[in-house]
């Protein structure tokens, strides 16, 4: 794959190149010249042609956030990158370059047409995010394994595929294999696939296809199950009670507790642990279920608040629109009367009256906005009190339940200590009938050693409980603070935007009157 431009000096995709390309593609008539003078914003560009420019590396395209079509063919690009922000891209041409690996396309979720024709690609992969892909051109590359075709089965919208010029295209079963494994394909190597060919291909590869479909169905079920688990986990995280609907917290207490695991082999401890775990898990489930209920209440409170704010803003806007409509009807009538009036004193008087009407409208609109600000401030403050109270109550009750977990741990610790001391006494007297594992027996050298071991286990358990409680409290407090802060900031921004809109409209109306020339009126 020699490139005529390989001998030329590589070019950098800098602002100068991009501005030149945008300018060349823009309209050339008077409108185009005006656009060039004023400057074209990259974010407004929908199509960009950068072919035959000896580009080695894709760069500086982050400002083209609304780009739909990008042409980068016939360059010397070796690596796909720099396309992360082009999420609206629909059409991408990277043909006739030096690309060896498909990569850097994970954010192009809207891409429908991709050309990688005439590169150095040997494997088809890393296209999973391109769920809308309809056209894929990979001809004249180095793909030599037919199993690459199986990878393309995941693209349900794929209808056009080009693979001619690859080693696999020389295989005797090339066309039949592709037609069998990609039954929804319409065009292969720029030729339409007829129904007869599809039927022959399906019959020839039926056994392999059936086996593959079975594996795909199993994989799909697993993916759906995993997706459902993740969605459920996110729901639990939103309620701040993830992993409390079972023995996770209890198990985590013993995961790093080597002494506690040794002590579990003491006579009578197994039954003690089982009873302890059952009671502990019940409390965790109580926290979990309570958390979900409280999350639903918080959601209802937030939804109700949002609805109230929306209704208040809508009603206020409708009042403003009515006042503006009444003003404009009167204003247009006044302007018409001014143009028909021939007496200068009367004209001056009428203009002053119009100006007074503009001032009155300004006062009315600002009064409406002030009323809305006061109304929303009261609503926001009430919501803030409610949500803070709800969060406070939730924390209080969770802490109470966590205290019950600590009580269970303290009780278990006391019982375990009793059994340990009793076992030590039996060992000293030689009355212990049961055999103990060597690592456990090593703890019973003296009373201090066994007391320290039981105490260390107890400390680990309490730390795990404390950490889970602290995590829950910290996260829900942070959530509450961020939510309230955002609501206040959003209201400030809304108010500023509305005041700006009112001022701009009033300034326009007043400027229209100020620029009214008597000579034009008299004419």
Swiss-Prot record:
Residues 166-206 form the LRRCT domain. Residues 358-391 form a coiled coil. SMART domains: LRR_SD22. InterPro entries: Cilia_flagella_integrity, Leu-rich_rpt, LRR_dom_sf. PROSITE patterns: LRR. Gene3D superfamilies: Ribonuclease Inhibitor (3.80.10.10). It comes from the Eukaryota. LRR repeats lie at residues 44-65, 66-87, 88-109, 110-131, 132-153. It is found in: Cytoplasm, Cytoskeleton, Cilium axoneme; Cell projection, Cilium; Cytoplasm, Cytoskeleton, Flagellum axoneme; Cell projection, Cilium, Flagellum. Keywords: Cell projection, Cilium, Coiled coil, Cytoplasm, Cytoskeleton, Flagellum, Leucine-rich repeat, Repeat. Pfam families: LRR_9. GO terms for cellular component: cytoplasm; cytoskeleton; sperm flagellum. Disulfide bonds: none annotated. Belongs to the DRC3 family. Component of the nexin-dynein regulatory complex (N-DRC) a key regulator of ciliary/flagellar motility which maintains the alignment and integrity of the distal axoneme and regulates microtubule sliding in motile axonemes. Component of the nexin-dynein regulatory complex (N-DRC). Interacts with DRC1. Interacts with TCTE1/DRC5. Interacts with DRC7. This is Dynein regulatory complex subunit 3.
